[in-house]
Each structure stands twice: as structure tokens, then as C-alpha cells.
Amino acid sequence: RQNTQSSCSRSLSRFQHFVFRKDYSPLHAVGISIFHSIAAFNNAGFDNLGGMHNLIPYKDNILLNITTDVLVIVGGIGFLVLVDIVKQKSFKKLCLHSKVAISMTAVLLIGGTLILKATENITWMGAFFQSMTTRTAGFSTYNIGNFSKAGLFAMCILMFIGASPGSTGGGVKTTTIFVM
């Protein structure tokens, strides 16, 4: 299983290399893509691009947005949920914990996206990315210093909730909020 996860991370890192190689030397682009992929999976969100602009220059880059989305979501869903998905291969057969973690993740992603799209002047892709990364990863494709109070409040709620148990993300956890 670790080989599968490792292969997935390496593949997504290669996709990100295509994005960064336009702005950096080949070796630097490889380093950035590897670092960014690991940070995304681990929900770390470190800005290694300098200048405090994080991923803002890449806000319209579909490839970078999708690979980062996938890595952050997979890292934030929880190891036990991932194992359950691989073993069961059907939502109906998943254990209750996995169903709650997946359902709450979907609700938070969709709800956060709708709220951010309604409160901010950003694209749908940007609203989804910010909703996804706000919960635990901390990446940014928009300057959140320019967001409205309503948008920032929604982001604070998402940060408080965070990721699912057994994941690389923080927060009080999706299952805790579900039980409450």
C-alpha cells in the first residue's frame, strides 16, 4: 500500500514539475514540485516560492490546482479511510467512520466552495481550492487579506473543523463535528 501511495505522490509531483518548469530552472522546478507535493499531502502548506505570494501566480493553472487538491484531500481524509476504500471498493461496504469522514469532507468542500464563491470575487476553481486548503493545508491562490469578513469567518470555521482523524491534517476533526 505504501508503494501505491508513494507512486501516486511521485506521479502528482511530476505533474507539478510541468507547472514550475516554466518559471524556474529544471533542477529548481524538480525541487519545488517534490517539496510542494510532500507539503500538500502532509497538509503543511509551506510557501517555498518566496516573496510571501504562495501559489497566487498559479491561481488559473488547472494542473497545479487539481494535483494540489488531490494530494491535500487524500492526506486529510485519514489513513484508515484510505485502507477501507481500497479494501471495500464500495461506499455501502465502508465502515461508519469512513462514511462519515468522506461525507463530511464532501459537505465541507461543497459548502465552503459555495460560501466563498458567494462572498468573494474569485473563480469556482479558486473557491474550491481555498475551501479545500483552508481546512488544514494553508496554501493560497488568492490574497486572503483582501477577503470579506464573511469569507474570512467561513474560512475560520473550516480551519476549526479541519481534517479527518488519522490524517495528516489538524482541527477538531470532521467526525467530531458530525457527532456534535
Task: Annotate each predicted stretch with a short phrase.
Residues 1-180:
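Membrane-proximal intracellular helices of multi-pass ion channels
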